[in-house]
Amino acid sequence: MAFRNPIYQLSNTEDLNLDIINAPSLENSRRSSATLAVCTTEDSKFLYGTTPSGGAEWCSEGINSVRPSKRLLRRRRHVPRWISDSFRTCLPKSSGNLKEQALQPSLDRNPCRNGQADEALRNKRIGIAEPSNYWHGIIEETYDEHHQRQRNLHLIPENWQDVNLKNGLVAIIDLATDHLQCSKLIIYVDKHLPNLPYLVKSFHWVGFEPIAHPNCVDHAVFGMDL
């Protein structure tokens, strides 16, 4: 069971340094009403906030002033076996090795300087903590029929019961579009969920479309062009 910060309700608070969350770079007025998605990769850690009324706020500059503990630098986040198996089955083989990678934040550079995502993000495992859940994903870099490079963000949440489609997905869509520079968001939904019809309706309402995927036996796949 995930431990949660009573103020922000972020899952798995051990993944975060509370000094970073409370960094002065995020104003109190914005912090009290913001929905936060916390993005971690093997070589960077940065925060992304979006308000319920829309609009985005990057507060990654606060990370450079706070050094995470040695325990945090060494820590590996456990990836549930069923999620790893799902990615191994459903993702294209070009995504590379899907072994769990250590999350070691880099303090020497800003991963979103000038609004651009760090080049090291491509084909990397990524974790996103939003207010009521934790998402595991992979950023896959591909080329379209016109040989234009594009990034696809593939995501599976740990618990569909806690998915907040209104706030959580808005934060994730903004994160993928504005700063991870992804052109497509792909979400895998367990076909055996009792609330699957509700989720399918909700995904259609948000703008997702079903994607045929013969290799995905246990999951329905939904995609959105960003």
From Swiss-Prot:
One of its GO terms (cellular component) is cytoplasm. It comes from the Eukaryota. GO terms for molecular function: ornithine decarboxylase inhibitor activity. It holds the Pfam family ODC_AZ. One of its GO terms (biological process) is viral translational frameshifting. InterPro entries: Acyl_CoA_acyltransferase, ODC_AZ, ODC_AZ_sf. Belongs to the ODC antizyme family. Interacts with ODC and thereby sterically blocks ODC homodimerization. Ornithine decarboxylase (ODC) antizyme protein that negatively regulates ODC activity and intracellular polyamine biosynthesis in response to increased intracellular polyamine levels. Binds to ODC monomers, inhibiting the assembly of the functional ODC homodimer, and targets the monomers for ubiquitin-independent proteolytic destruction by the 26S proteasome. PANTHER family: ORNITHINE DECARBOXYLASE ANTIZYME. This is Ornithine decarboxylase antizyme.
